[in-house]
Structures are given as C-alpha cells and as structure tokens.
UniProtKB/Swiss-Prot annotation:
Protein name: Uncharacterized methyltransferase AN0656
The protein's Enzyme Commission number: 2.1.1.-
Cross-referenced SUPFAM superfamilies: S-adenosyl-L-methionine-dependent methyltransferases
Family: Belongs to the methyltransferase superfamily.
Induction statement: Down-regulated when grown with elevated levels of potassium chloride.
Pfam families with a match to the protein in the record: Methyltransf_11 (PF08241)
Function, as annotated: Involved in osmoadaptation.
A molecular-function term among this protein's GO annotations: S-adenosylmethionine-dependent methyltransferase activity
Keywords: Methyltransferase, Stress response, Transferase
Record GO biological process: cellular response to osmotic stress; methylation
CDD domains: AdoMet_MTases (cd02440)
InterPro entries recorded: Methyltransf_11, SAM-dependent_MTases_sf
C-alpha cells in the first residue's frame, strides 16, 4: 500500500497530465481550498463520475438503509443515544446524497452531513433548504457540520455524535480519493457505533492512473486539482478491515461493485464520459 498522491505518481508539478486533454494549465491546491472554490460550480460543471455515482446510489442506498434498519431493530438494551437512528453523510459536499438520505430514511432518523469544506457546506445548506429538508419545524432532522478527516477534532462534531452517541450507519461517496486509507477508515470508525454500517463509493484506481478530480476555475482558466490518491480496491478492503470493518455483500453476493464505462453509459452520463470508454472508473462497497 502507498500514500503516494496521483500528482506524485504522474511525476509532474503544475503541468499537464494524461487525463487533461482540454489544454488548461493545472494548479494543485490543498483539498479544502480546492473544494471551497469548486463549491460554486460543483453541481453544474457536468462531472460524469458524480452522475454515475448518483445513478448507482439509487440502488445502493436502499440496500444500505435496509441493512442499517435491520441491525438497529434487532438490537436490545439500547442506550438513549442509540435509540435515535443517526445516519452520517461523511464528506457530504453540496448535499447530493444527504438529500437522498433525508428522503429515503425513516422520518424519525437524524441525518448528519459532515464535510471539511465550509464552502461546500454553505451550498449544501442552501440546497437542502430549497428542497424543504432543512429549516423546517424539526430543525434537528438534518444538521450539517465541519469535520476534517485529516485533522479530526471531536469537539467540531454535532453534539448528537459526540461521546458514545455514535451513528448507526454512514455513507461516504467520492471522498476516499482525497484521504490516506488508514486515516479515512479510522475517522469513519469514530463516527459509527459497533455493528453499524459504512457504505463507500470512490473513483477506481484504473481511472486514477490516468487522471483525478478537478475543475476549471472560470476566473483564472486553470484546472484546479486537490490532493488525490489512486486507491486500489484490495488496499481499500485491507484498510477497512484493519479499522475493524467487515465487507458485507451488497446484494447477497457482490462484495465490490465496479463500473467500466461503455457506450450505453455515455448516453446516460453525457459526452464527457466518452473519453473513459473501456476504463473502470468507479467502485462501491459496504
């Protein structure tokens, strides 16, 4: 296992990389800074991997919620803190899947969106309020908070996640790319109570060998890239197990779901997916 970044693996500084055929100069910045800048256009810049993730989560999220509810309903002698079903969106970004959790989870569940980027959280709050799932009579149903997996501070967590009052389950979509594996799973384990579930999706290492997350800053014209890692699926599973997680089949048999782009997917995801035909770009596991 390696913590070498994609920038280091590609062997360049501020030049062009193999996945950047649009002619923009590349600028590497700290991840939080990058996402604070990206927040303004994150939902509208045509990110095909985000679109693929949204499509896959339509199937994965109900399966995840079924696992969490079955485990919670079957547990006896729960403490008062455990009696409230808490679900975390770890690295919630602009609230894309926080919204889906709020819509799909039982009404008594509390949804907690955490992200290291204040800029992304600001957009998330606006999106969730616009959809009527924040700022309602029950202000505790959906809450957001700043939480940096690279420098976790328990006091920064919402009160409902502090101490022993941990979550029944968490999702983390397209976040792992930016965090060393052990740090990610150790941080996730702090948020989830024993027996809870974690659903993770991420950019596949086959895509990471070519390029990484990033966006074009309309002001400077530069391609802004955060710190990213091309995590191999086997290394991800090993790190999860070191942190005390056990991989659970997503549908009774499929432990890891991987997606390779084909022409049919291009029609679904848009023209930006075309250059990734025949490349495995995404995976998910729980």
């Amino acid at each position: 296992m390696t913590n070498q970044t994609i920038q280091e693996a590609l062997g360049h500084g501020q030049g062009n990389d193999l996945g950047n055929s649009d002619g923009h100069r590349i600028e590497y910045v700290e991840t939080i800074e990058a996402y604070n800048k990206w927040a303004e256009v994150y939902d509208t810049d045509g990110n095909f991997l985000q679109a693929l993730d949204t499509f896959e989560m339509k199937d994965l999220l109900p399966r995840f919620l079924c696992l969490v509810q079955t485990q919670t309903n079957g547990k006896s002698n729960m403490t008062p803190g455990e009696q409230v079903l808490k679900l975390v969106d770890l690295g919630c970004g602009t609230g894309r899947n926080t919204l889906q959790l709020a819509k799909s989870a039982p009404k008594e569940a509390q949804i907690i969106g955490l992200d290291a980027s204040p800029g992304m959280l600001e957009v998330a709050e606006g999106n969730l309020k616009a959809q009527g799932v924040m700022g309602t009579v029950d202000e505790r149903r959906v809450v957001l908070g700043v939480y940096d997996l690279l420098s976790p501070r328990p006091e920064s967590l919402p009160v409902s996640l502090r101490g022993e009052a941990r979550a029944s389950g968490a999702i983390s979509t397209l976040v792992l790319e930016h965090i060393p594996l052990d740090k990610f799973f150790e941080g996730a384990a702090r948020l989830i109570r024993p027996g809870g579930y974690l659903l993770v999706t991420n950019m596949h290492a086959e895509m990471g060998a070519i390029s990484q997350a990033g966006f074009v800053d309309v002001t400077s014209g530069k391609k802004i890239r955060p710190t990213s890692y091309a995590h191999e699926v086997g290394n991800v599973i090993a790190a999860a197990e070191r942190a005390g997680f056990e991989i659970v089949p997503l549908n009774g048999a499929e432990k890891v779901r991987e997606r390779r782009v084909n022409e049919e997917m291009v029609a679904l995801l848009g023209s930006r997916a075309r250059k990734w035909v025949n490349v495995v770009v995404w995976f998910g596991l729980s």
